[in-house]
Amino acid sequence: MSARHKARKAAFDLLYSAEQRGQSLGVALDEFDVRETARLEPLSELQYVRDIVRGVDDNQIAIDEHISAHLKDWTLNRLFAVDRAILRIAVWELLFSEAPKDAVRAEAIALAEEYGSDDASRFIAGVLGAIVRES
C-alpha cells in the first residue's frame, strides 16, 4: 500500500469520524496527531494527511459547491457521509493540490469500493469525471 493511499485512507477516516461525532476538523486533526503520529511512516504520509484535512477544512465551501454542481437530483446533505467524505478529499486534491488527476480518481473509487454503498464507486467516478472535465 503506497504512502499516499495510506494518507488518503487516514484522512477519510478522520473526515468521516469528525462528521459522525459533530466535531470540527481542527479538533479531530489535533486528536489524530496525538493518536497516530507514531503509527504513520514516513513523516511525509502524516504531513499529507494534515494537508488534506486542513485543505478540506479551509476550502469546504468551494469544495461543496463543486460537488453540488455535479449532483443530479441529489443534494450534498442527502449523500451518505462516507461518499461525502470521499468526494471532499478527492475534490480538494483535484482543485487545490498537485496530485495527478487519474491517481486521485482511482484512489477515490478504491475507497468507495471498500467503504461505500453498492453503487458508490460508480457514483463517485461520475461526479469526479464531470469535475475533471470542467477544470
What are these model-predicted stretches?
Residues M1-S121, A125-S135:
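N-terminal interaction/assembly modules
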